Each structure stands twice: as C-alpha cells, then as structure tokens.
Amino acid sequence: MRLTDPGADMLTRVRNALQARHQKVDVPASRLKVEIARILKEEGYISNFKATEEEGHKVIRIYLKYGAHNEAAISKADRVSRPGCRVYVRRSEIPRVLGGMGINILTTPRGVMTGRQARKEGVGGELLCEIW
C-alpha cells in the first residue's frame, strides 16, 4: 500500500504510541522523516531516534519521552501542509506556536528547520507541522 502523506503517517504513529504509553515506535524511513526526528530530538520532544534496517526495510526507531508524572512530552502534533493543500509561508508569516512554547517545522531551500531557525536565517518555506 502506498501512502499519500508519509509525514502525517509519522506524526500519527508517534501520537498513537504516546497515547498507548509505548517507549518506542517504528516508522518507515525517508530523508524527510529523519530530519523531522532530528529536530524533535534537538527540541527535546523525543529521547532519541535511530535509523536502522529491519527485514529489508529501512525504519526509524523513535524513542519517546515522558515527564516525571508519565505525561507525554508531545501534547499535540498537527500536520499543516498536506498533499492536497500545500501551505507556504514567507519569513514574516511564520506563525509562533503557543506564543513560543511549541515549534513548527518547515522545509526551506536551506533544509528542514524549525520556524525559529527559519526566521533567524531569513527564509520561508513549506510549513509541515506544528508540535507542542
């Protein structure tokens, strides 16, 4: 079966694993998903991730993060730009998520980065998702 929106599939798998209180989740690998996982780790939303190969398929194993009272580090993860309705923003139009408490992830000509990094570097791009 072919996925029409692999980014949304990754976010959904992570959300479902967090609700089920799993320690890790495997998602099919792609360069974009590895970059999203890297940003989530840098921003402290996941513990770690590892790109591996299992049974001939490349997968990303994402180790989820929970707080002291077993609350998930990610409260909400929403896909913004979709295959049927792409959302592009200029540097000045990049929204702040929860007044700076969350992050948004963009693909830019300089690579995948957070909204904060994109504003700092002065670039816009496709607004992939918002996480808090």
Task: Go through the PLM ranges and name each one.
Residues 1-132:
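Core subunits and conserved enzymes of cellular information-processing
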